[in-house]
Amino acid sequence: MKALWLVSFWPFGKSKINDFYQNLFVDSIKSLDFDITFSLTQFDEEKVKDFIDKKKINNNYVNIPKTELPSGKKYSNKLMLDNALKQFIDSNEFSYLVYSTADILVPNNLFSTLSKIKLDNFCALIYPNTHVTNGVIKNNYWPHFGIDLIVFKISREKALKFKEMI
């Protein structure tokens, strides 16, 4: 089984804190015992491609110039999802489509836990186990705002229907 991981990175070299947490995120992905390819849709963020190449992460990299976004927008989750679904459908080799932010630590048992779900198709909403605000760990157990990790286990056919809906 393989996973296509939809994520976008902030620019590198502008914030040591952001760089640190994005490095931790990638290292947590690399430590997983699972075949993962990043679906990266970037919007002119600096040094992202260099970072990914240096980290030797399998990836499908697409850059959309900020000039093609609506006025005042920095990114588009819709365009990111469009690109990821196209890659998922075209490759026909992925079992999971994962969305996350790039500032979380991914638990090393993620896919072993997901593999225990015996459904052919499902969506898992996973809350982070560590909440960090401005570089400070706030709490490991308190409920947090936002869903930072979403996992779809879907067939190519379901992905086609999903793409039609968005």
Show where each model-derived region lies.
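Short, charged/polar "capping" segments at the starts of alpha-helices
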Residues: 14-16, 44-51, 132-134
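Conserved catalytic core of nucleotide-sugar-dependent glycosyltransferases
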Residues: 77, 104-166
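Short, acidic, metal-binding catalytic loop of nucleotide-sugar glycosyltransferases
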Residues: 19-36
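Short beta-strand-to-loop acidic/aromatic patch adjacent to the donor-nucleotide binding site
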Residues: 94-107
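Active-site-proximal specificity loops/subdomain of glycosyltransferases
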Residues: 43-95
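Short internal beta-strands
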Residues: 37-42
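A short acidic, amphipathic alpha-helical/loop segment
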Residues: 28, 50-51, 109-114
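N-proximal low-complexity "stem/linker" segments adjacent to membrane-targeting elements
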Residues: 1-24
